[in-house]
Amino acid sequence: MASKSWLNFLTFLCGSAIGFFLCSQLLNILLQEQADVQPNMLHNDPHARHSDDSGHNHLKGQMDFNADSSQHKDENTDVAENLYQKVKVLCWVMTSPQNLEKKAKHVKATWAQRCNKVLFMSSEENKDFPTVGLETKEGREQLYWKTIKAFQYVHDHYLEDADWFMKADDDTYVILDNLRWLLSKYNPEQPIYFGRRFKPYVKQGYMSGGAGYVLSKEALRRFVDAFKTEKCTHSSSIEDLALGRCMEIIKVEAGDSRDPTGKETFHPFVPEHHLIKGYLPKTFWYWNYNYYPPVEGPGCCSDIAVSFHYVDSTTMYELEYLVYHLRPYGYLYRYQPALPENILKEINQVNKKEDTKIKLGNP
């Protein structure tokens, strides 16, 4: 009798175990399907800036939107080209060995081409891509170490090659021409940095890591020197907050990156999360973190936006097309914010010389 009861008990345990296993497998399949249909972009942690993989299907090959340049042959890029020469921006992109094919190569094929200099920073060197090996481990807890070492590397090797130094993730899309306009009003010898300004924990605020941030040459000097003199230390693994605290200690100003109408230019999410009302629930951390009152809907974003975050490989090319190729026929651009007088004067002088050449019949 006892052996029969024991056998029944074992049968029950085995059945329960098998049932639990099958249920867990089914649940995993359902959750994976849900992730593929609606990727999890709403991170509950405001400092979860850099993810290795969001579950998306990544494009395998690069795309070249400049292959057919015939439609752009009459395009006047004088102002952008002048700013390219006058406001030199070095971009360094935080990536990892496993993200080179998934993400970094699409950054390389799109917006990174407009940097005056671009570097891809990883834990390991890759001479083919290429990447700079920072000799760190991978993982979220290493982000600030990678940031410190990346800025130190840039300072030691490229300080005189640029005026401004931008950090971006490999899932950030940056419109460099708009960034140069923003920076053109400032002196790179001024200790200042720009990005999407958040307010908690730092009196002057700090810049969102995911939306990217840009340091002036003097800010970079002070940041690197602060670790040599131990004014700043690796106080936290939370990259953007720790960097913001250091900037306040070394008296680097947290600049206002809004446009003349008060709209934000750096964005910590993809466009639809800012543009569509109700996409971000009011209980979401984002609403309490902004230094300036956030706007939901069409008023959220400047016409001269600088960056968006959590951009997958497909969206990277969509933004490239929408920003640099799509135009409504018959319209002159409606919003052209003013340039600094010195740059505007130089552009006008160049245009006068070109007009003179044309009148004289010179090529």
Swiss-Prot record:
Pfam family, one: Fringe
GO cellular component: a single term: membrane
Stretches of the chain found on the membrane's Cytoplasmic side: 2-6
Lumenal side: 30-363
Positions of UDP binding: M94, E138, G139, R140, K146, D169, H309, Y310
Pathway note: Protein modification; protein glycosylation
InterPro entries per UniProt: C1GALT1/C1GALT1_chp1 (IPR026050), Fringe-like_glycosylTrfase (IPR003378)
Record-given protein name: Glycoprotein-N-acetylgalactosamine 3-beta-galactosyltransferase 1
Species whose genome carries this gene: Rattus norvegicus (Rat)
